[in-house]
């Protein structure tokens, strides 16, 4: 049985963490990006399928490719962010299953059903995007996840050679608290949950 994390850790991960739109001029290192991956990869996925693939965009060239794919409301904050993670999914994720899930022939579950493969990859890469956000928060970084972009343009710009498919974007860095909006409300337990 696991011990509950303390209140401060819960604040860091959930109740005091915010989605940032403005960023301080402070870099994110290669070592930090590696640490993010090393945490997020440990989160559970269906049959350990681990379909997420990440492109950490931070160079001027990378930002130049990403810019035209963004909705107008996401352009400035993304260009300012030290890093933007493109969370994508690998259409051929199942080719890694003999290593990742050696308990049976899991690869055949997906090669025999392209629809199941796509649904599994998209669902589990979305789950892994959440792990990325919480890994960033655990490591003292802030995030700004976004879905306002043209997926086809991102795929053409970044994934023409490997067939990956973009899911969502996450800006990463040190957020500027002066550019935060007031915290928006959340649904109560009674509004969002049922007991069965």
UniProtKB/Swiss-Prot annotation:
- Keywords for this entry? Flavoprotein, FMN, NAD, NADP, Oxidoreductase
Similarity section:
Belongs to the nitroreductase family. HadB/RutE subfamily.
Stored Pfam families: Nitroreductase
Record-linked InterPro entries: Nitroreductase, Nitroreductase-like, Nitroreductase_HadB/RutE, RutE-like
| Official protein name in the record | Probable malonic semialdehyde reductase RutE
UniProt key word NAD: yes
Q: What does the record give as the function of this protein?
A: May reduce toxic product malonic semialdehyde to 3-hydroxypropionic acid, which is excreted.
- What's its EC? 1.1.1.298
- PANTHER family the UniProt entry points to: MALONIC SEMIALDEHYDE REDUCTASE RUTE-RELATED
What is this organism's lineage? Answer: Bacteria, Pseudomonadati, Pseudomonadota, Gammaproteobacteria, Enterobacterales
Q: Which reaction does it catalyse?
A: 3-hydroxypropanoate + NADP(+) = 3-oxopropanoate + NADPH + H(+)
Native organism is Klebsiella pneumoniae (strain 342)
Instruction: Tell me the cofactors it needs.
Output: FMN
- Gene Ontology molecular function: 3-hydroxypropionate dehydrogenase (NADP+) activity
